[in-house]
């Protein structure tokens, strides 16, 4: 299976331009025979909102919105699975969401659970459980940017059978890329972090998108700056074995009776 990410710099508020640019990256990924490509968080709108009017203007319904409809058409025509960060409107609420657009045109939505900084002003926290989505070649879990700070997220997704964690991001802090090495091996999963780059309204983003294997190997990575699509070949079943040594299994060795304080 070939998996990848797009790293680029959206222009705030320029939804049509951002979508057209991403479609060019996706076409390049298709030329490399990609099966799955992850886009950054809020890829079509930009990130640094300054008013609810901006949120209202730039948000859209999923899957009825123009961004999702365009990506559905592309996914179906190119046998591609896409995970895209979108500013979602649901009646009078707004969410920082990720849409999984499957190659058959089906759409699933995850809403960011752990809102970062001023996102708490604009968005409602996610109201849906951490779910695993079955595609034709792999089982996918989704988290968005700051969700990574909470190790329970990846652990729950891994326990539910996710082989690949899709991680659309707009990272500003410098920790995530290193932390995902540990998260991948601690849960024996692939993690694709698709980060944006550049500066927007005074906020600098860290770039350095990457794909990490269950054994901590970095299979692909980008620099802090620069726009590109990267695709690598993986075997998702590498994430199925939780065996660490002859005597140790990641799931069997858990002592859940001692973990109850995590729920307090």
Residue ranges of predicted features:
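Short polar catalytic/cofactor-binding loops
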Residues: 7-13
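Cys-nucleophile CN-hydrolase/nitrilase-fold catalytic domain and related Cys-dependent amidase chemistry
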Residues: 15, 23-103, 173-187
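CN hydrolase (nitrilase-like) catalytic-core segments centered on the catalytic cysteine
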Residues: 67-81, 148-229
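C-terminal beta-strand edge segments of enzyme domains
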Residues: 132-134, 196-264
